[in-house]
């Protein structure tokens, strides 16, 4: 059996201390996360991202020529953990940093890199992801949005016209750009049907409508695309190569969301708040608490394995395994905290236990089972990897 030792480097503790000081000094108590639609919270995320960028921390592991900090993937892992442990004060910027930027670095043209990467690294632009559809959430290869050729006699002179609908599009109401998947080759095999486009959200034909949800703040949307013009310079990678790039990007996304760190933080913070009351908790609760911490350690190690395999064909399945473990822990911790606090777990505001973070976490834990692909699909991806059935 191979033993894996994930060394975050000698400077990990120093980096954590630096990040925690920045958060303590610039993020107000009671801030609850990436999906806020509160104007004051959005202003906090915007100013905090600009501060991180000025410190060379926002895109810590990006190459310096693209505006990054030139750090290691393990330094970036520490950054992710500290951000999620403090309810992701980067707000909607995490999407651009975690996977949109890396996808453009890997597959973009020189012009696309010059246009987009420095702006993402500076925290100046919000991106959204136009993948899921009403009839294609889990099986993205079956999406129905079409990019029809717009030949020499069309309005573009060359390119496509995109028509269709997207759902569950986070941040579309505030995004400046969208990574949009559309079918350009309907007669090709499924993996070769799709193309990714980098589309400005102010392009004619795009309509965004909010989707109310149990998550509370408005961050989910549906997008309607009515003959949206797309040009050759908008294509990320090659036409027909969208499915491969999407799978790679989704692996980055799953690893980039370090929710296990948020769960650990909630447990440790509540243990501190309980003080002497900890000893009066039923033994069954304390046993569950310890088991939750052990399971979170497993989720963390699975995430580290996925990070270590970023350039490996097994990266997608490793990311799925990490996401499965984290999602299970999300719900396990949410239920445990509710059992400890009872009705007080529903309180919100700065006077509530953990400033209301427990109720907020419970709602997001329910949604985590379907976000970025259902947990059942993640298990299927892991099974294919174990059986050697790569597709």
PLM region spans:
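C-terminal helix-coil-helix/basic helical segment that borders enzyme active sites and/or dimer interfaces
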Residues: 31-39, 275, 279, 283-286, ...
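A short, Trp-centered hydrophobic/proline-enriched beta-strand micro-motif
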Residues: 123-131, 181
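Glycine-rich phosphate/cofactor-binding loops in nucleotide/flavin-utilizing enzymes
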Residues: 2-5, 74, 78-79, 99, ...
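Glycine-rich beta->alpha junctions and the first turn(s) of the following alpha-helix
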Residues: 6-10, 206-299, 368, 384
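A short core secondary-structure module
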Residues: 143, 159, 163-208
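Intrinsically disordered, low-complexity terminal tails and inter-domain linkers enriched
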Residues: 149-159
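Internal helix-loop-helix
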Residues: 53-114, 118-123, 171-177, 296, ...
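Amphipathic, small/basic residue-rich leader segments at the start of a protein or domain
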Residues: 1-92, 115, 119, 156, ...
């Amino acid at each position: 059996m191979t033993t894996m030792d994930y060394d975050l480097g000698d400077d990990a503790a120093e980096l954590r201390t630096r990040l925690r000081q920045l958060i303590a000094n610039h993020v107000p108590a009671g801030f609850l996360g990436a999906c806020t639609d509160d104007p004051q919270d959005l202003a906090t995320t915007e100013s905090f991202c600009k501060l991180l960028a000025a410190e060379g921390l926002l895109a810590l592991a990006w190459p310096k020529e693209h505006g990054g900090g030139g750090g290691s993937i393990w330094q970036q892992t520490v950054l992710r953990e500290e951000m999620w442990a403090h309810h992701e004060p980067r707000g909607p910027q995490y999407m651009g940093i975690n996977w949109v930027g890396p996808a453009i670095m890997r597959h973009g043209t020189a012009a696309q890199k010059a246009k987009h990467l420095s702006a993402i690294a500076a925290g100046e632009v919000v991106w959204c992801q136009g993948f899921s559809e009403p009839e294609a959430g889990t099986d993205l290869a079956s999406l129905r949005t079409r990019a029809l050729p717009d030949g020499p006699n069309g309005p573009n002179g060359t390119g496509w016209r995109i028509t269709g609908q997207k759902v569950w599009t986070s941040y579309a109401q505030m995004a400046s750009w969208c990574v949009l998947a559309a079918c350009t080759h309907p007669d090709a095999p499924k993996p070769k049907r799709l193309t990714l486009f980098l589309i400005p959200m102010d392009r004619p034909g795009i309509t965004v409508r909010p989707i109310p949800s149990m998550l509370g703040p408005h961050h989910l949307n549906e997008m309607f695309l009515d003959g949206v013009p797309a040009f050759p310079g908008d294509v990320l990678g090659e036409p027909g190569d969208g499915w491969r790039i999407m799978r790679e990007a989704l692996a980055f996304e799953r690893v980039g969301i370090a929710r296990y760190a948020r769960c650990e933080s909630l447990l440790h913070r509540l243990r501190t708040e309980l003080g002497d009351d900890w000893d009066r908790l039923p033994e069954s609760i304390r046993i569950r608490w310890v088991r939750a911490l052990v399971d979170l350690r497993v989720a963390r190690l699975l995430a580290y394995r996925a990070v270590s395999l970023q350039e490996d064909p097994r990266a997608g399945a490793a990311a799925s395994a990490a996401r499965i473990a984290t999602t299970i822990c999300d719900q396990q911790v949410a239920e445990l905290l509710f059992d400890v606090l009872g009705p007080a777990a529903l309180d919100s505001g700065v006077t509530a236990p953990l400033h209301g973070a427990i109720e907020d976490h419970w709602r997001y834990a329910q949604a985590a089972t379907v976000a970025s692909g259902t947990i059942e699909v993640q298990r299927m991806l892991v099974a294919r990897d174990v059986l050697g059935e790569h597709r």
